[in-house]
Design a protein with these regions (language model features):
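Domain-level signature for soluble enzymes in the chorismate/prephenate branch of the shikimate pathway
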Residues: 2-103
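Walker A/P-loop
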Residues: 117
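ATP-dependent small-molecule kinase phosphotransfer cores
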Residues: 130-183, 187-191
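Hydrophobic anchor at the beta1->P-loop junction of P-loop NTPases
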Residues: 108
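P-loop (Walker A) phosphate-binding loop of NTP-binding proteins
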Residues: 111
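ATP-binding Walker
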Residues: 114
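Conserved phosphate-donor/acceptor-positioning beta-strand/loop module used by diverse small-molecule
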Residues: 193-210
Length: 210
């Protein structure tokens, strides 16, 4: 009798669990539909801005959204978790805008100190674009610094790594590629940059670079 009662209680608990899971699934459906609708609205906003010459960047709107969320989440549970979700939503909205604006890669060239990292960080903040730091990637893959690569394998090897990485980047779109100072010295590298990107030359005063 106890076995039967124990089994009945276990079945009841399992039924409750299934009901909760079903409710969770319904929440996921609502969230998914809302996200898809939101993304479509973001695209419509971009179309409107282009048609009416409205500035693409409107940081005050993002500030208003943050203020709204803070007001809505006052005294509520899981405040940090909800904030993380909305941060991700905002970041993905920026990505949608970036894809609309830049259906190509942005390739930054210039001497060290010309501002490539500064511009890259700005584009990452404003449009949530992925950043490809060529020197950093080559160093990470080699497991050594750029200077050690030169010393161990020679400049020719390093330049070949640059060329191969640029070729690899042809499979990517809507990313910022920050090139090493000597990358454009190879004509074939420039050709690769232009295949799927817009090349931006950054300049600076000699005293800034040196």
């Amino acid at each position: 009798m106890r076995t039967s009662t124990h089994k009945s209680g276990k079945d009841k608990n399992m039924n409750q669990l299934e009901v909760l899971r079903e409710s969770l699934g319904q929440c996921d459906e609502i969230i998914l539909d809302a996200l898809l609708m939101r993304n479509r609205i973001v695209e419509d906003i971009m179309v409107y801005k282009e048609a009416n010459n409205v500035p693409i960047l409107q940081p005050e709107q993002e500030a208003k959204q943050k203020e709204w969320l803070e007001r809505r989440m006052q005294e509520k549970r899981h405040k940090n978790e909800v904030a993380d979700v909305f941060e991700s939503i905002t970041r993905n909205s920026k990505k949608i805008q970036a894809r609309k604006l830049f259906n190509y890669n942005i390739v930054l060239i210039g001497f060290m100190g010309a501002g490539k990292s500064t511009i890259s960080d700005y584009l990452k903040t404003v449009f949530a674009m992925d950043i490809i730091e060529m020197d950093q990637i080559i160093a990470e893959r080699a497991g050594m610094s750029i200077s050690d690569i030169f010393e161990t394998y020679g400049e020719q090897y390093f330049r070949d790594c640059e060329t191969n990485l640029l070729i690899e980047m042809q499979s990517r779109t809507n990313v910022v590629i920050s090139c090493g100072g000597g990358t454009p010295m190879r004509e074939c590298n420039v050709a690769e940059m232009k295949k799927n990107g817009r090349v931006v030359l950054l300049t600076a005063k000699p005293e800034t670079i040196l």
